[in-house]
Swiss-Prot record:
PANTHER family per record: LD18447P (PTHR43804:SF7)
Cellular localisation: Cytoplasm
Organism classification: Bacteria, Pseudomonadati, Pseudomonadota, Alphaproteobacteria, Rickettsiales
Spans traversing the lipid bilayer: none
Keyword Cytoplasm: yes
Disulfide bonds: none
Protein name from the UniProt record: Peptide chain release factor 1
PTM text: Methylated by PrmC. Methylation increases the termination efficiency of RF1.
Length: 355
């Protein structure tokens, strides 16, 4: 089937769904048709814009062939033809992007987990910097940032930290942040002024609802214990800390941030559900597209994706060869959009090349 035939088929389907919805159908049939109709709205709008430009180009070319046109009119028509010819490839690309298979998780909120990697205390300090950077970014985007757990070192660093970020299409924007982030800077404790390299790992998971992942009580092992502070001392006289293990997958989440065992359990279940959902997504993605494993967005957490070089004031994303010399704006102010948009565009381009 040609590209044009495929577009015509989509327009026919959209029109038929509209007629069906107007015919008075009810119940599950109405719900199903409404969902399909809504899912097609965006691509149909882009198809109509593309078809309109094609039609206008054809009309302009035909008009240009008419006898007796003065020079001013001919120049005006040629300008219009030039504009339309330039716009058509962009409109066609927009249609193709709209036709790409959607990741069901893209529209979801996200859970972000940051863990200190190699580099000791400096790595923990960098993990805290990254976590705060994502909090600033969430604020800029108008998303709700809820801290789930922080395991601190007592001097400003984070061994690990997690948060729930709620908003529209959060996961689609943040999913490319998963991986190893490397920092190069002179630690405050370094008397010789030598640059140290350390790293932190970021994992971004789509926040799963109960409808996405059903967790049976029989599949959970829940252990409670007393919360401990940064030095290992017990900071609570009750067993408020919770460790939940999902027996079928072996995935474990431990939480002790809240004084209430009930609150710790609720937060731990939220993280557990997200991890199980992400594991299932990974398996399906691997089965569906093994050939795309090496692409941006493969989510390989062992992959070094970005370097933050403070002496040079630069942030470099190694997947797309993009370097920005504004480290303070990125790290302190959370201005990540240039990286986010470039990564999304790169991912779309690679997917389009497979069509």
């Amino acid at each position: 089937m040609s590209f044009s035939d495929n577009l015509a088929k989509i327009l026919d389907k959209y029109e038929n769904l509209g007629k069906k919805l107007s015919s008075g159908i009810m119940g599950d049939e109405f719900v199903k048709a409404s969902k399909e109709y809504a899912e097609l709205e965006d691509v149909v709008a882009k198809i109509k814009e593309y078809n309109k430009a094609k039609s206008e180009l054809e009309e302009a070319n035909n008009f240009k062939l008419e006898v007796g046109l003065d020079n001013a009119t001919l120049e005006m028509i040629e300008d219009e033809i030039h504009t339309l010819e330039n716009s058509l490839p962009k409109l066609e690309r927009a249609v193709k992007i709209a036709l790409l298979p959607k990741d069901d998780a893209d529209s979801k909120s996200a859970i972000i987990e940051v863990r200190a990697g190699s580099g000791g205390e400096e790595a923990a300090l960098f993990a805290a910097v990254l976590f705060n950077m994502y909090q600033r970014y969430a604020e800029l985007k108008g998303w709700r940032f809820e801290i789930l757990a922080i395991s601190d070192t007592g001097i400003g660093g984070y061994k690990e930290a997690s948060a729930s970020i709620k908003g529209k299409d959060v996961f689609s924007k943040l999913k490319f942040e998963s991986g190893v982030h490397r920092v190069q800077r002179v630690p405050e404790t370094e008397s010789q002024g030598r640059i140290h390299t350390s790293a932190a790992t970021v994992a971004v998971l789509p926040e799963a609802e109960e409808v996405d992942i059903k967790i049976e009580d029989k599949d959970l092992r829940i252990d409670t214990y007393r919360a401990s502070g940064a030095g290992g001392q017990h900071v609570n006289t009750t067993d408020s800390a919770v460790r939940i293990t999902h027996i079928p997958t072996g995935i474990t989440v431990a939480l002790q941030d809240e004084k209430s065992q009930h609150k710790n359990k609720a937060k731990a279940l939220k993280i557990l559900r997200a991890r199980i959902y992400e594991e299932e997504r990974r398996k399906k993605e691997q089965e569906r597209a093994d050939s795309r494993r090496g692409q941006v967005g493969s989510g390989d957490r062992s992959e070094r994706i970005r370097t933050y070089n403070f002496p040079q004031g630069r942030v470099s994303d190694h997947r797309i060869n993009l370097t920005l010399y504004k480290i303070d704006e990125v790290v302190k102010n959370g201005q990540l959009d240039e990286f986010v948009e470039a990564l999304i565009a790169d991912d779309e381009a690679k997917k389009l090349s497979e069509i």
